[in-house]
């Protein structure tokens, strides 16, 4: 498991992402890129577009 903080864990092979509201969520990709909206994330090597709804290379 991955410890995001003292109270939050994510499964191995995922990435901890901190939302703008201070809530942790698990991105289902190892070394994922967390989007600013606090909901979405992208695979390693991709980044979020300005709407945080699409991943760009």
From Swiss-Prot:
PANTHER family: GRANULIN (PTHR12274), PROGRANULIN (PTHR12274:SF3)
The record's account of how the chain is modified after translation: Granulins are disulfide bridged.
Classification of source organism: Eukaryota, Metazoa, Chordata, Craniata, Vertebrata
Entry annotated with the keyword Ubl conjugation: no
UniProt keywords, alphabetically: Cytokine, Disulfide bond, Secreted
Molecular function (Gene Ontology), one example: cytokine activity
Species of origin: Cyprinus carpio
Cross-referenced InterPro entries: Granulin, Granulin_fam, Granulin_sf
Name this polypeptide is given: Granulin-1
Function: Granulins have possible cytokine-like activity. They may play a role in inflammation, wound repair, and tissue remodeling.
Localization of this protein: Secreted
Any one cellular-component term (Gene Ontology): extracellular space
Family to which the UniProt record says this protein belongs: Belongs to the granulin family.
SUPFAM superfamilies registered for this protein in UniProt: Granulin repeat (SSF57277)
Tissue specificity statement from the Swiss-Prot or TrEMBL entry: Ubiquitous.
């Amino acid at each position: 498991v991955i410890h995001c903080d003292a109270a939050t864990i994510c499964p191995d092979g995922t990435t901890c992402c901190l939302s703008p509201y201070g809530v942790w969520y698990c991105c289902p990709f190892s070394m994922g890129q967390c989007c600013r909206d606090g909901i979405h994330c992208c695979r390693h090597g991709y980044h979020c577009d300005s709407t945080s709804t699409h991943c760009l290379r």
